Amino acid sequence: MKKLLAFFLFLFVMPLFAHHGRGATYDMKKQVTLKGVITEVSWRNPHVAIYMDVKDNDGKVVNWAFENSNVSTLARQGYNRNTLRAGQKITAVVNPSAQGTPRGLVVKVILADGKVVMSRESGANPVD
């Protein structure tokens, strides 16, 4: 009976850990810096998403998607849906997709005036 209970507990708990495992989705050992213009900010759970147009090496515009913390974590840190808006020029430092797709996990965002927002460097803003 204990083995059966442990098995079912394992089945329900493991997906929770899988959701927060970033290693398979993002290259956590690498950071890329991208400059561009925000096209959309999706301020909703489970994670705030930032979409940004970036010119690649050939001059072609590529729309990147960046995952950030959840709404309540960012709100506790003083950010809201007006912190970033479509049309803003920003620099995003991200852990890139492990699959090579134009996606990333936000390390920090730098506004046009040089102000750093939504940083998780040195544990300042851990992604939930």
Where are the predicted features?
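Short boundary/loop segments of OB/S1/cold-shock single-stranded nucleic-acid-binding domains
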Residues: 17-32
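Short nucleic-acid-contacting surface segments enriched for D/E, G, S/T with interspersed K/R
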Residues: 76-91
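Positively charged n-region of N-terminal signal peptides that target proteins for export
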Residues: 1-4
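OB-fold/S1-family single-stranded nucleic acid-binding modules
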Residues: 97-121
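Structural detector for short beta-strands of small beta-barrel domains
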Residues: 30-46
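Short aromatic-glycine-enriched beta-strand elements
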Residues: 44-54
